[in-house]
Amino acid sequence: MNKSKLKTDFICIATSGYTVDGRQITAQELHEMAETYDPEHYTANLWPEHRRWFNMGQVIELKAEENEKGETQLFAIIAPNKELIEYNRAGQYLFTSIEITPNFRNSGKAYLSGLGVTDSPASVGTTELKFFNAEQKGSVCGEFIKVDFSAKEDVEEEKALRTLANVFKKLFSILRPNGKNEPNPNNNNHKEDHAMNDKQFAQLIEAVKGLDAKIDNHFSAKVETKEPENKPEEKKDEQPQSVTAEQFNQLLITVQALDKKFNELSQEQTTVPSGVPTVEKENVYSLNGYNIDLSKGF
């Protein structure tokens, strides 16, 4: 027997009188079925179109009552299973049709031996089955979120561009230390200036190498990405929204050329006449191999 907690109230499953196909249901049969029905003794199952393939629930209780027209009606409490509920939700098996055993076990009385669920009932006045509320309140629905998998590629391109910008920022900070291209008047030791430049050049080289590796990884990952088979046709008139691999390579070549030029400049030393020791003088500075004595004026 179905142990489901879902049970209906009393619903009308038959009305005395003639059926739509010409058969007759007597009031006495309906009263006898209400009197004799015992699900512990014999359970009337719910059968789809009266076929014994699989049941769709059970009949729990019966009662018979007279209506205003003087007709006897048989009422039942039924317990549908999930299959019947799903069919009913789809608009199927909306009514019931009783199965009467006239002389049940030689008792001389009728017994409800089964109850069909159908869309074409023979008896009139049967209650339409409805196991759910079409307008249920308090339903919880998930929010639709569009996932754009191309966003990851855009983020990678943005990171590469940001890295390139940081390299040029370091480059310009070397060209203009402290925001000005002026020597430090309190520094008479040009070797210290060269040492600082070497350190800064080393930082630039590391930054360029790191950028080179990141760009290679970035575009090699894009090459390995498989394109969808049914790729939508791209519009030729649209302008590209990101930096191409060729543009990145051109920028990288430019940075490498600057790196080479700075290496050459960093290796230049102050020209000193042969055999004459270098004498440190105040207000004398070296610029690209030339000594400038600011004390003498210009």
From Swiss-Prot:
Q: Which family does it belong to?
A: Belongs to the P2likevirus scaffolding protein family.
Segments of this protein annotated with the region Disordered? 223-243
UniProt GO MF annotations? serine-type peptidase activity
Q: List the EC numbers from the record.
A: 3.4.21.-
Which ranges are cleaved off as propeptide?
A: 1-2
**Coiled-coil ranges per the record?**
none
A biological process from GO: proteolysis
Naturally occurring in which organism (per UniProt): Haemophilus phage HP1 (strain HP1c1)
Task: Kindly provide the name given to this protein in its UniProt entry.
Answer: Capsid assembly scaffolding protein
In Pfam terms, one family for this protein is Phage_GPO
Role according to the record = Scaffolding protein and protease involved in the icosahedric procapsid assembly. Coassembles with the capsid proteins to form the procapsid, in which the scaffolding protein is found within the external shell of icosahedrally arranged capsid protein subunits. In a subsequent step the scaffolding protein molecules are cleaved by the viral protease activity.
Q: Where is the composition biased (Basic and acidic residues)?
A: 223-239
The source's superkingdom equals Viruses
Q: Which InterPro entries match?
A: Capsid_scaffold_GpO
Keywords (alphabetical) are: Hydrolase, Protease, Serine protease, Viral capsid assembly, Viral capsid maturation, Viral release from host cell
Active-site residues annotated for this sequence: 21, 50, 97
Q: How is it modified after translation?
A: Autocleaves itself into an N-terminal fragment containing the protease activity, that remains in the capsid following maturation.
